[in-house]
Amino acid sequence: AEYWSILFNIALYRRVGTLDPGAARRLIIEPVRSYSLVYDDLAVDKMLRATGGHPYFLQLLCYALVNLHNRERRNYLTIEDVNSTVAEVVGLGEAQLALLWSESTPEEQAVLLALARLLSAGEPGTQATIAGLLEESGLGVSRAWIAEAISKMVRREILQRGEQGTGRYEFTVDLMRLWLEESKSLGLVVEEVM
C-alpha cells in the first residue's frame, strides 16, 4: 500500500466525485451503442450499485464487461454478467481501494470492517449495530466514537447515509465492501485499535 501511496502522491490531486444516476447511465450505455452492445436494465442498475456511480470504478466495470462481450461475442449483457465480473473489477481497482484503506485511521478501519460484515450478512449498518459488532469483537467503544469515524468517512465519500430517517449507512462504492471482505480481518484491526 505504501508503494501506491507514493505513486498517487506524485500526481496532481483532483477530487473525483460520483456521477448523478443519469450521467452514470450515459457513461455505461452511450460509448457501446454504436457497437450494438446492449445492457439489460437490471445489469445497469447493478453496475450503479456496485460502483456508486464513481467514474473510475464504473470505467473499470465497463472495461471488464466489454472484454467479456468481445470474448463471448454476445451483444446483450445481463446482471449475471455483471455479477461474474465484479471479482475481476475488485482486483483491477485494488490500488485505489488500498489507498482509501491506508488513508483511514485504525478506528475508521474497524468501523469499515464492521459495516462490511453487517451489510454482507443482510443486517442494517447503523451506529448501534456497528457498536454491537465491535463490542462482540472485543472493542467496546462509545457511539460518539463511532459517529465521529462515520462522519469523517462520509465527508471523504467512502460511506453515505442510507434511506432518510433510517440511521443506516452504506458504502458509496460497494466494491469497497467486497474488497474488505476478501482482504481484511476485523480481528486484526480490533487488536491494532486496542
Where on the chain are the PLM-derived regions?
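Short, hydrophobic-biased segments on the C-terminal half of alpha helices
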Residues: A147-S151
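Alpha-helical DNA-recognition elements
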Residues: A64, K152-R155
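Helix-loop-helix "sensor" segment of P-loop NTPases
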Residues: A1-R49, R71-R74
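Winged-helix-like regulatory helical subdomains adjacent to P-loop NTPase cores
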Residues: V38-D41, G53-W145, V193-M194
